[in-house]
């Protein structure tokens, strides 16, 4: 999956879960600082991302997913690993 598609899916999830405008969901946006997510919002976002992309995001990884771009990069990396393992 291309990063553009990953971004679009992440953006849709963030817009739905946080109730914000799509324009606010930029690669450099911080979930907490810029988008106003609290700890419960973050948990809901993680669960939605795991279900949407069929991946598991470890507790350790969640602490590193500070911005939209961090999240896109992490998901893209996980999807590439899954594709490699399937071959």
Model regions: which residues?
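Phosphopantetheine-dependent thiolation modules in NRPS/PKS and related acyl-activating systems
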Residues: 2-37, 46, 51-87
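Two-component histidine kinase catalytic core, primarily the HATPase_c
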Residues: 41
